[in-house]
Amino acid sequence: TESLEKLLCDFLSLNENDWVLWTAQPNDWNDDCDKFNGCFFVVKNMPRYPQHANCRCTLKKINQPVPYVTANADCDIRKFSEYIFADTHNNGKKSLFENWGYAKKDSELLSQLFVSQALQKYCAGDYQLKGTNDFCAKIEIIIDLPVKNGSIRSIKSGWKLYPYGK
């Protein structure tokens, strides 16, 4: 319990805008700790800590991530070319993007725009933790998309959070 008290004391000394590296202790429990292992979180948007009564995860204060240096993002162009603009997916996204002035030929531009904004916003702590899947933590980032009439549309986008800023 002494080490747990130290962990909680260290945690309580953090400010909401501090960044931490989450380190999970290997275990056989069916918990989310492993999915956060090695991930960077801003304190105000990090998972509940401790995760459970037997949690031995540690938080280490780190410097704020720097885009393209200590943090990276990836958005496969196929998210647009083969999903959003595909005729086989009738989910309304294609017509929405087309109404905003985008077409399949803009897939690379959209991918770059999403990556750039997601990375900048993640590193600024401007994201929301949305839970986990079977393998990793999930976050939501609002992408501000310029549209053909000159206005901006804000779109919720989902991202997987991987260890060490990926």
Describe every region a protein language model picked out.
Residues 54-60, 156-161:
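Catalytic nucleophile-His microenvironment captured as a short glycine-rich beta-strand/loop
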Residues 1-54, 60-119:
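Domain-core detector
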Residues 11-14, 18-26, 32, 113-166:
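Functional cores of ribonucleases/endoribonucleases
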